[in-house]
Amino acid sequence: MIETDKLTPAVDRTNLDRVVAPQTKSAQEEALERALRPKRLADYTGQVKIREQLEIFIQAARNRSESLDHVLLFGPPGLGKTTLAHIVAAEMGVNLRQTSGPVLERAGDLAAILTNLEPHDVLFIDEIHRLSPVVEEILYPALEDFQIDIMIGEGPAARSVKLDLPPFTLVGATTRAGMLTNPLRDRFGIVARLEFYTAEELKSIVSRSASLLNAPIDPEGSFEIAKRSRGTPRIANRLLRRVRDYAEVKADGNITRQVADAALHMLDVDPAGLDIMDRKLLSAIIDKFGGGPVGVDNIAAAIGEARDTIEDVLEPYLIQQGYLQRTLRGRIATPAIYRHLGLAEPASAVVRDLLAEE
């Protein structure tokens, strides 16, 4: 059984408008993700080392009739942290209770969840880096000793009562592991970083999802979607659904490479997975600032986006792919993006390369 405490996230218009955004866009998309989500480790594609480790740790815990050690999953959004939490609970044969760091505002919120857990249950806390210090303090003894201290009464009559908890497994997920406090991080026995997926791994995911959606697709069509999915299963599944729509209306319903290419071209997703916002940022650096170096505030003014949006939403993938470089003097367009856009690299690039090395 799965119980979920809902959190309504702040609306990020830039992400809502981007088909290649790694964040979940709506409740409807969350429901579709759940339908496509693998239920067992045997069905989980990618993250080979993590999968192998979890298979061993879960089997060992089950053999000893113990709860699994607490698990911390971190990495960029859309890579399968929530999916793995659900799989851990399914493989252990226990219930999963799901909540989110920002939802747990008071110590009582966490205490209410912990005291209702059954032995060996899995508690999944998404965005665990956003736990308040007060809640985090309550969590420490719960993780170590399976006990919590709660205050009863107020003022001089207040007293502390220690409550025993059933053994349970906390699975924490975060996109910002660096924001976790050391005491909290140290209480996780299993720590795993999720990496971006290869195109071949995403091809398998697209093929599996297409089968579940009853969408006919050939291997070349799967690969065309996969290679534009920015290494992220969530994006791959979203693109698949949009390509399926295109195939049903503009073609015969079968997703071939040509159909996928035409659909993704319509969506402004190029062969490298860049969308119109990515190209807008890179074009501004190249056309308006000579390829850089240029400060992020100047870029923000040039393209009409907030600084935080550029740093948190647009830049990470461009930097990871080697199209953009951050230096002390500002952002620089790399030779790779000139090649991708079919532009001649200016002679000043040599000077910029020297600046980038400083």
Swiss-Prot record:
The RuvA-RuvB-RuvC complex processes Holliday junction (HJ) DNA during genetic recombination and DNA repair, while the RuvA-RuvB complex plays an important role in the rescue of blocked DNA replication forks via replication fork reversal (RFR). RuvA specifically binds to HJ cruciform DNA, conferring on it an open structure. The RuvB hexamer acts as an ATP-dependent pump, pulling dsDNA into and through the RuvAB complex. RuvB forms 2 homohexamers on either side of HJ DNA bound by 1 or 2 RuvA tetramers; 4 subunits per hexamer contact DNA at a time. PANTHER family: HOLLIDAY JUNCTION BRANCH MIGRATION COMPLEX SUBUNIT RUVB, PTHR42848. GO terms for cellular component: cytoplasm; Holliday junction resolvase complex. DNA binds at R307, R326, R331. Residues 198-268 are annotated as: Small ATPAse domain (RuvB-S). It catalyses: ATP + H2O = ADP + phosphate + H(+). Residues 271-358 are annotated as: Head domain (RuvB-H). InterPro entries: AAA+_ATPase (IPR003593), AAA_lid_4 (IPR041445), CbxX/CfxQ (IPR000641), DNA_helicase_Holl-junc_RuvB (IPR004605), P-loop_NTPase (IPR027417), RuvB-like_N (IPR008824), RuvB_C (IPR008823), WH-like_DNA-bd_sf (IPR036388). GO terms for molecular function: ATP binding; ATP hydrolysis activity; four-way junction DNA binding; four-way junction helicase activity. This is Holliday junction branch migration complex subunit RuvB. Mg(2+) binds at T82. It is an enzyme of class 3 (hydrolase). The gene is ruvB. Pfam families: AAA_lid_4 (PF17864), RuvB_C (PF05491), RuvB_N (PF05496). The lineage of its organism: Bacteria, Pseudomonadati, Pseudomonadota, Betaproteobacteria, Rhodocyclales. Belongs to the RuvB family. Has 3 domains, the large (RuvB-L) and small ATPase (RuvB-S) domains and the C-terminal head (RuvB-H) domain. The head domain binds DNA, while the ATPase domains jointly bind ATP, ADP or are empty depending on the state of the subunit in the translocation cycle. During a single DNA translocation step the structure of each domain remains the same, but their relative positions change.
